[in-house]
Amino acid sequence: MHIICKSQCGNRAALKRPKTGDALCKECFFAAFEAEIHHTISSSNLFRRGEKVAVAASGGKDSTVLAHVLKLLNERHNYGLELVLLSIDEGITGYRDDSLETVKQNRDDYQMPLKILSYEELYGWTMDRIVAQIGRSNNCTFCGVFRRQALDRGAKLLGVDSIATGHNADDIAETVLMNVLRGDTARLRRCTSIRTGGGEDTIPRVKPLKYSYEKEIVMYAHYKKLVYFSTECVFAPNAYRGHARAFLKDLEKVRPSVIMDIIYSGEQLRFKDTVKKPERGTCTRCGFVSSQQPCKACVLLEGLNRGLPKLGIGKKSKGERMIAKQNQELALRERANLVKNDF
């Protein structure tokens, strides 16, 4: 027995949407997926007519679908945007060099200008060399910090008004979980924000795919026959995010709505005024956005250049600092009791 598309178009259903459970034909799925992203963009006022927007392009499924859909919606709904691709070459042999070929294919397919910036030219280091120095235990710390700043540098060079990133609903739910588990209230405050930055000296970042499920992004790319790079980073298996992702997938099997539930919970969180929130300013060394002086990128880079690669990555988690404080207080009390007993 054939299942008919729920939208009552009369066509046979080709898939079941992971997000809603609806059985849809391909064309109705495309329409629903694109309409939801358009709603996200318009309801959140992510763009203004005449703006120049850099799409952070990695060649993966998320950035490829983002570039495709933004181009389509820009033309369909007359956003009036100038779209460009911005890609970062971290210098990972067997991964980024191959994925950049996909980015170049995206450039040709969507007829968008492409700017590629490398860690080598920005910092004088590649991730291959960094991993050779530090091993694989903290490589994601270096890469994440450098990549975020590299996007800011590239955006400034291109003179764009905002950076559109391919963060999807799964990514955001994972980040909420990670920040809860780490006790990182500062990041927990902003990790669900659809727009970040945008101060006097910063270029805002927006997440048009914030409410798009990863499974649906893969389905969209598959049925649209989009060209994307699907190999995982060779340094990623040890990443903390991978554990949060595995946990989220297990939860999703039991409760399909858990991704949106976690995002909603993150959006509704409130913190006491006494919780210290780090102020985001400008690094006195490099001039880019930072919540510390000097910025994390400058500290890590200084460590590499001085032959001290562990510099800047030894900070304890909130929980570890709390345990250390409790132990210190306990030791002081025990010492005080010993002194009292001596008398």
UniProtKB/Swiss-Prot annotation:
Its EC number is 2.7.7.-. Pathway: tRNA modification; 5-methoxycarbonylmethyl-2-thiouridine-tRNA biosynthesis. Keywords: Cytoplasm, RNA-binding, Transferase, tRNA processing, tRNA-binding. The keyword tRNA processing applies. InterPro entries: CTU1-like_ATP-bd, CTU1_C, Ncs6/Tuc1/Ctu1, Rossmann-like_a/b/a_fold, TilS/TtcA_N, tRNA_thiolation_TtcA_Ctu1, UPF0021_CS. Its main location: cytoplasm. GO terms for cellular component: cytosol; cytosolic tRNA wobble base thiouridylase complex. The keyword Ribosomal protein does not apply. Pfam families: ATP_bind_3 (PF01171), zn-ribbon_14 (PF16503). It comes from the Eukaryota. GO terms for biological process: protein urmylation; tRNA thio-modification; tRNA wobble position uridine thiolation; tRNA wobble uridine modification. Disulfide bonds: none annotated. It is found in: Cytoplasm. GO terms for molecular function: nucleotidyltransferase activity; sulfurtransferase activity; tRNA binding. Plays a central role in 2-thiolation of mcm(5)S(2)U at tRNA wobble positions of tRNA(Lys), tRNA(Glu) and tRNA(Gln). Directly binds tRNAs and probably acts by catalyzing adenylation of tRNAs, an intermediate required for 2-thiolation. It is unclear whether it acts as a sulfurtransferase that transfers sulfur from thiocarboxylated URM1 onto the uridine of tRNAs at wobble position. This is Cytoplasmic tRNA 2-thiolation protein 1.
